[in-house]
Amino acid sequence: MENKNEAEIFEIIAHGGNAKSLAYEALNSATEGNFEEAKKFLDESEQEMAEAHKTQTRLIQDEINGEKIDTSLLMIHAQDHLMTALSEKSLIEKMIELYKKLEEK
């Protein structure tokens, strides 16, 4: 059985994965003291996160409006990708703040 929301699910997975990868690129830049580049990567990560969230919100609104949204293992995987990306990005932002403080000393 094919999931009719498969394209949207893969959008969430792709954008969530991109967001997480970009956040780690930001962390790598910060560890080298390149905070301008780190900010650029975090901004790009935020854009990817926004795209994933937009797709997620659209699916939620469709379900609220009575459309049947299949809860598949693939959908759960997409939500997991997005949640971990959000969580890790938040932690990475705090780590970058710490690197900045260490650099100032």
Which residue ranges define each predicted feature?
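Terminal alpha-helical segments
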Residues: M1-K105
